[in-house]
Amino acid sequence: MTASALSKWPTCLACLRRLAQPFGTSAARHGEPRARAVPVIRPIVHTQTRAASHRMRLQDQGVVVRLLEDIPKFGRKHAIFRIERGRMRNEWFPKNKAEYMTPARFQELGLTRDAIGEVDRSFVIMSALEAATRPKPEEQKTEEPVPEVQISQVNVPDVTPETAHALLSELIPNTLTFHREPVPIPISQPKPALEPKISPLIARHVPASTPETPSTGEARRAIFGSVSSSDILNQIKALVSGHEEASRIVLGPSSVKIVGLAEDNDRIRHLGRWEIEIAVARAGGLDPVRKSVEILPSAQ
């Protein structure tokens, strides 16, 4: 079965002209009358064929992106390369793994097109590599257990309360000295009082005025920092550390008490002399060891 002449529409102008002519006749040549036109037998079917184009289409090289995190088999963070548009649009950009590198973005980062690199297929994150090389639980069970080395503990005899009381009384000096920088006292200059005018004969018999002595509050000057019971305890431990038996005495934060301070206060904040009590554990009827602490101004 033959196809009709109009089954396929021609696309060139010459084919349209041939189809527009009547069948059985041909157009007269230039200068010849139409009556002398020579009849020509034309086929009814006109099939137009076109060869397929073998030209290579330009391959889409993808879009330029910049990684915002390490991605295995693609590259490290801040790497710039080309990637498929679909992967960037559907996976990386929604999950904030990469950003588009537009000309404006290149200018913001101070980069040029020369910074565009290649995909690093050999890049592997170390955590993923460690997870891949980590032995499985079944393999860990098959490993032989390493025998534990047992260290024998040496039993050190405890110091009796009576011995501890005697050693602390002997090794600790009567006064423990600490140096702190005192807070300067602002000096206010009083206005000179107007002296009444008296006769020189009377002023000769008036006794000279004596300077005023500082008050008790000025004598107890404040200091920068403070001396706590922990500071006193550390100094006591340093004094007894050289003695073989006294170094085994158990002393804790509650072993030192500063006499004259409130119960919730264990810090000395002024210059002066303070009494302390050193309690011995399990002392029973023994009194605490009494010593003194003196806070002196540090050398300027």
UniProtKB/Swiss-Prot annotation:
* Entry keyword set: Mitochondrion, Ribonucleoprotein, Ribosomal protein
Q: Does the keyword Ligase apply?
A: no
Cite the InterPro entries for this sequence.
Answer: Ribosomal_bL9 (IPR000244), Ribosomal_bL9/RNase_H1_N (IPR009027), Ribosomal_bL9_N (IPR020070), Ribosomal_bL9_N_sf (IPR036935)
Q: One GO MF term, please?
A: structural constituent of ribosome
Listed GO biological process terms = translation
Q: Which domain of life is it from?
A: Eukaryota
- GO CC terms of this entry: mitochondrion; ribonucleoprotein complex; ribosome
The family classification in the record reads: Belongs to the bacterial ribosomal protein bL9 family.
Subunit record text: Component of the mitochondrial large ribosomal subunit (mt-LSU). Mature N.crassa 74S mitochondrial ribosomes consist of a small (37S) and a large (54S) subunit. The 37S small subunit contains a 16S ribosomal RNA (16S mt-rRNA) and 32 different proteins. The 54S large subunit contains a 23S rRNA (23S mt-rRNA) and 42 different proteins.
According to its UniProt entry, the function of this protein is described as:
Component of the mitochondrial ribosome (mitoribosome), a dedicated translation machinery responsible for the synthesis of mitochondrial genome-encoded proteins, including at least some of the essential transmembrane subunits of the mitochondrial respiratory chain. The mitoribosomes are attached to the mitochondrial inner membrane and translation products are cotranslationally integrated into the membrane.
- Name of this chain's protein: Large ribosomal subunit protein bL9m
